[in-house]
Amino acid sequence: MLIGVRTARRLAVGLTMVAVLAACDDSAKAGRSAAAGASASPAVSVAPSPSTEAPGQPVSSAQPSKSPGGGGASASPSLPPPGSAYQGRLPKFGKPPTPHRINVPEGNSAPWLSRIPTDQPVAFITIDDGWIKRPEALELFREAGVPVSLFLTINAIKDDPAYFQRLQDAGAVIEAHTISHQSLKGKPYSFQRKEICGSADQLGQMFGKRPTLFRPPFGEKDATTLKVIHECGMKAGLFWKETVDKGIVRYQEGKTVQPGDVILMHFRDRFVDDFIAALQAIAAAGLTPALLEDYIP
């Protein structure tokens, strides 16, 4: 009997161990299944780092947006609707006043203007060169809805005249700024004539309208420059009163834009910031952007 009892106890212990081992094996299988399921699910998205674009430039998301119903990602990136990319940054202007044309003295030389002599509450935006062609310019011009004059250099634009054609179609007026962007001051008559007349002729061929105004590179000119501008059929040489670069407006006189001032900026990397800064300076002075060509007969 004693042997039988001991044998029964050993059998019971053995059966208990088998049950424990089976339970452990089931737990391990469950853990492996859970791990496999976790690795098959989408990885957690890491938040994108802040944009390195210059301020003022619209940045479209690199990640597709979710549909309103909470479904899968849409096929295209989420972009602002047309006409709203710069909403909130562009000042609003009313219609400019009916222009009062200035008196241009007669003679054998073109007048030299850095300001239009007018009491009307207007200022003029001019943009030079054309080396850097920011894609935002077209939408910016459309949204702002203000007149601008582009003084273009042939060598800067000849690789992509279609870019400037689109700006012209949006309302910009194209003027001349030489072929090669060399300083004209002190150069021979023949050199200046080639640069001044040649640039106007080529721009007329490219864009269907010959320029009526001219700006020498760096604002540098001499008596020959003004004489050749006149001989080439253009009405005036242009300088400026304010410049804009990297979103900062710099004034030659005082700390505000004055009625009739000509503002200079360039086609640069910070084009958006510069253009908006020019508009904000005009608005802060209580003025309205107007078209330069409307004031020069």
Task: Annotate each language-model stretch with its function.
Residues 130-133, 152-160, 183-189, 215-221, ...:
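Acidic-and-aromatic substrate-binding clefts and catalytic sites of carbohydrate-active enzymes
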Residues 83-176, 180-183, 202:
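Active-site beta->alpha N-cap acidic-glycine motif
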Residues 210, 220-256, 289-296:
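His/Asp/Glu-enriched short active-site or ligand-binding loop at hydrolase and phosphoryl-transfer sites
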Residues 2-12:
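Bacterial N-terminal signal peptides that target proteins for export
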Residues 12, 25-114:
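N-terminal low-complexity, Pro/Thr-rich disordered segments
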Residues 20-23:
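C-terminal motif of bacterial Sec signal peptides marking the signal peptidase cleavage site
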Residues 27-29, 142, 147-149, 173, ...:
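CE4/NodB-like, metal-dependent polysaccharide N-deacetylase domain
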Residues 123-127, 148-152, 173-176, 212-215, ...:
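Structural recognition of the beta-strand scaffold that forms the well-ordered cores
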